[in-house]
Every structure is written in structure tokens, then in C-alpha cells.
Amino acid sequence: MKKIMLIASAMSALSLPFSASAIELEDEVGLECGPYAKVGVVGGMITGAESTRLDSTDSEGKKHLSLTTGLPFGGTLAAGMTIAPGFRAELGVMYLRNISAEVEVGKGEVDSKGEIKADSGGGTDAPIRKPFKLTPPQPTMMPISIADRDFGIDIPNIPQAQAQAAQPPLNDQKRAAARIAWLKNCAGIDYMVKDPNNPGHMMVNPVLLNIPQGNPNPVGQPPQRANQPANFAIHNHEQWRSLVVGLAALSNANKPSASPVKVLSDKIIQIYSDIKPFADIAGINVPDTGLPNSASIEQIQSKIQELGDTLEELRDSFDGYINNAFVNQIHLNFVMPPQAQQQQGQGQQQQAQATAQEAVAAAAVRLLNGSDQIAQLYKDLVKLQRHAGIRKAMEKLAAQQEEDAKNQGKGDCKQQQGASEKSKEGKVKETEFDLSMVVGQVKLYADLVTTESFSIYGGVGAGLAYTYGKIDNKDVKGYTGMVASGALGVAINAAEGVCVDLEAGYMHSFSKVEDKYQVNAFIASACVRYNF
């Protein structure tokens, strides 16, 4: 019995240390598992962002200018939970500012007008011009000549029997296609317009209801003014005749003070002026003269042909440079009015020739008024104007032209002095973007190596980033995109329940800000973590 008691007491004594160790371990686990808070500072380096500006010295137009990026910095705040010894889950918010990048441009300075000057590549200081607004010449209503009026009055409809026999049968608008074309070409009026009260539907142009009809000298006491029509039927010959006569009278009453030749010349000069910066880049010579007031019919024809050839050459030069632009060829297809052809063939007297000249010029103005090809070219040039490489090339050309103008009146000595000064000019950097970012992520951490004084851990995270700031010195709307990150760090036990986390990682963005810049970053942080 004594032996049994001794064995039992010995076993009890041996088991006591193990019980104490278990209790101590349970206490340690209880301290490690629980919530914590973390606060700290962050900094890093941007990677992945590429300039949208093309290097103008690259002949292929594919090389982008290099970016000099800033060093973003900010702070972080997080709350987490130790879910098991060595494993943590965390919800954190990080704020980064100074996410900026600069691109090298020509030497800049501010002139007396407050304009920034840029190096032309040849080295001359010239103001950087804001992109000029490209708009096609506004339509000019030309007076309807007597010949056009008489021609319009006699335009017939396609007979209804013939229209029904056609395959497929012609509707009412196609029956009156010739009259509708006259309205557009000679009067600048669309027969059908959108119905403001019924979206998606068309209606007869209300302008056609404002043309007086009926006897211009009505009887009655007192005499009544000409009737306003309640409706307009384009197939009704009497209504059509009254409409043509009324339009001709109104157009002559409101005709521009300048002659048709002067109006045409001004339009052509404006088009040439608008396209010249682009033509200079493409190496195309653009005429700089309009039409003389005494221009003959042949000169007008030749000028329209010259305009069409120049526009087509410009379009062809940029065909394929950007997507969905400069695709359709330009053919103005100017056709002289029939009355001008007759007068030209008959060798008319001076007064008749002047009338024919005005008729041809007016017809050319109407052609430019309604040219969808010219309107499309302007739209394509607006797209081209936004291209970074073209914009820089236009700035360089403008600066070079100013340099040439200055040097033209200077002597050789001043030119040599200017050249020596230009060789000393350096480069300046222009901010391409300056952004700030707020990032919210869920992160998971796991200890890789653990000692009494420190531990080495790794972690992954995913979340959302809200980016805002300026691009090309213009405010951009806030942009939200997904991010993911990975990190490796060291946690130093500073005091009971307090750790200092030194962490380095990489954050990847899955989308681009304004479809231009993908902002990824290497990030380092120093945080204090307090376990509750």
C-alpha cells in the first residue's frame, strides 16, 4: 500500500510542472489573440506610369517622353484582429499624396504677358499657345438668283403612277427629291427636321410655313396682307411656286453686304488658316491667297479645285495616324449652275458675265455651307489636335516660325549671338500629373519567423483606391479602381502589447486613371501596433 502511495505522489509531483506550463501557455494565447489598432507613416515610389506625350524627335511617332516621378508620402490607420497565434486580419486606410510626375520640355520662362515660353527645338523662346478652337466656317445664306428662282419654279415631281411602278415604290419624299434638293442647295433649308414634341420623329420644317403665299396685292377694304399657309404640300405646284418666289424675295432682302465672290474668298481663306498648322507638320504647302473681287468663272472653278486637292492631300497625310479618323476621301464635286454654263458658252456681255460670276460664286458658297466632308475633316482634326505628339509638334513649329520672323530682320552678328545663347539653353520639367490617393484594403498577415524580440511576417491585401487631383494642370474627377498588394515586414516587440511594424511592399492598380495612367507603387511604412 505504501508503494502505491509513493508512486501516486511521485506522478502527482511530476505532472505539476506540466500543468503550470499549460496554464501559462493558455495565458499567452489569450494575450496574443484579440483586437489591435495600428497607426503610422508611409512613403514610396511610383512605377508603371507612362507619359501620354510622344517624343517629337521620334520619326515613327511611337516613343513616349520619359517621366520623372515624385515620391508619394502619407499616413495609414488600421484596425485588426489576431485570429490565431501568428495570423492576423486587418482593415486599413492609407492616404498618399504627391503622386506626381514631370516630363522634360524645352526651356521655359514667363514673358511680360505672363505666358510660358518653350524651347522650339531650335532653341528660341516662344509662347506655348493654347490649342485653338477648330470650327468649320459658319453657313452663309446667299441670295437666290433670278436664274435659280426660275429653275426652281419649274422643278417637277415624279408622277405618282411612275413612283408606284418603281421597285421598290417611291414614297412622297423621294417623289419630290429634286425639289427637296433645291431647298437645301439654293435656300439652305432642310425639308424635314426633328419634331421637338415627338422625339425620334421628323416633321416638315416650320420655316416653310412662314413664307407668304397668295396675291401680293389683294383686294379688300382694307387690303389684307398675303396669306400665311396653314400647311405646306411640296407636291402642290401652286404652293411650291409661291414658296420659291417667296424664298427668293426673302434671300435678296437679307443678302450679305459683301459680294458672293468676297464671301467665298473669306470662307476659303478661313479654311486654309485653320488647316495650316496641321499642313505644316505634314509638309504640305497651303495657299495663302483668296479670290480677287473680279475673279472669273474659271478662277472660281480653279480655286474650288485647289481647295479640294489641298484638303484631300491633308487627309491622306494623316490617314491611319489615329483610329476612326481621316478615312473618307474628300471630293468637293463642284458643279456650275446651268445658267452659268449657258452664259459661259455663249460669250456674254460684261453685265451678263458679272451675273454668271455671282451665280457661280454663290453656288460655291452653298457647296461649302453643306459639305459634310469638310465638317468631318474638322472633326478629325480636333481629334488629331488632342494627340500629344501633334500638340508638341505644333508648339515647336509655332516657335520656329516666330524665330524665323525675328531672325529675318536681324543681322548675321545677332543671329550668331542668338545661336550661342540657344546652345546654352537647358530643359525644364512640366508637371504631367499631380494626384492624391485614398486606399482602403483588407489584409491578411502570417508570421514566417518568430523569436522573443521580433517576428518576420508576410501579407497580402485587396481593396479599392480613390484617386483625384490634376492632370496637365486640369482638375480631374475622382476615380475609383481596384488594387491588390503584397508585403514583407518585421514586427519588433517594443513593450508589452506594443509592436513596431517596419514593412515594405508593392501595390498594383488594375485600372488606369482617366484611361491614361496606371499608378502602381512600391511602398514602405513604419507603424506602431497596440494589442488590446
Curated annotation (Swiss-Prot):
Subcellular location, record wording: Cell membrane
Segments for region (Disordered): 113-140, 400-426
TM regions (residue ranges): 67-87, 480-500
Pfam families noted in UniProt: TSA
Purpose: May be an adherent factor for rickettsial adsorption to the host-cell surface and a determinant of virulence of individual rickettsial strain. It is the major outer membrane protein.
Residue pairs linked by disulfide bridges in the UniProt entry: none
Keywords associated with the record: Cell membrane, Membrane, Signal, Transmembrane, Transmembrane helix, Virulence
Domain of life of the native organism: Bacteria
Membrane topology: Multi-pass membrane protein
Main location, first listed in the record: membrane
Secretion signal span: 1-22
The keyword Ion transport belongs to this UniProt entry's keyword annotation: no
GO cellular component, one term: plasma membrane
UniProt cross-references to InterPro entries, sorted A to Z: OMP/PagP_b-brl, TSA
Identification of the protein by name: 56 kDa type-specific antigen
Amino acid composition bias (Basic and acidic residues), ranges on this chain: 403-413
